């Protein structure tokens, strides 16, 4: 399966993840070490296999994953594609087998799994899931929706 991303552009515009830092007090990614006044990173970060192929790339905003994240197999085929908002999975998340067939597709909202489908390597549907509105996870989702509205993120 050919991926549709311009790997040259990702390497030119992005920053190698090895050149970034983790905050010791939060989940943020920093542009410099904390003792050198590191600030939350905004931009595109990537990591490479030894052969130069991209392992993954992630878009960050203010130190948190925000936007598209893609992972690749060493042969260059796409492994996964996920959307993040403010560090939380939000939207469609797809995982592929190395042969290019879809392995799973999930729908997330504020990192709460809303629905999921899983397939085997031949493309046969194995199972499906949808969140139950009576579940504790749905209560957490409602709380997170309210929080994001109050923060002006919705």
UniProtKB/Swiss-Prot annotation:
What main location does UniProt list? cytoplasm
Keywords assigned by UniProt, alphabetized: Cytoplasm, Toxin
Q: Which terms does the record give in the GO molecular function aspect? A: toxin activity
Gene induction: Expressed on rich and minimal solid media likely in early stationary phase; dependent on DegSU. Not expressed in liquid LB, but only under conditions that promote biofilm formation.
Instruction: List the GO terms this entry assigns under cellular component, sorted alphabetically.
Output: cytoplasm
Organism annotation: Bacillus subtilis (strain 168)
Name the record gives this protein:
Immunity protein YwqK
Q: What does this protein do?
A: Immunity component of one of 6 LXG toxin-immunity modules in this strain. They promote kin selection, mediate competition in biofilms, and drive spatial segregation of different strains, indicating that LXG toxins may help avoid warfare between strains in biofilms. Mediates intercellular competition during biofilm formation; disruption of the operon disadvantages the bacteria, but overexpression of the cognate immunity protein restores growth in competition with wild-type. In situ neutralizes the toxic effect of cognate toxin YqcG.
Pfam family for this entry, one? MORN_2
State the phenotype upon gene disruption: Deletion of the ywqH-ywqI-ywqJ-ywqK-nfi operon has no visible growth phenotype, however it is out-competed by wild-type cells.
The organism's superkingdom is given as Bacteria
Report the locations given in the UniProt record: Cytoplasm
- Could you describe the subunit structure of this protein? Probably interacts with cognate toxin YwqJ but not with other non-cognate LXG toxins. The interaction inhibits the toxic activity of YwqJ.
**Signal keyword on record:** no
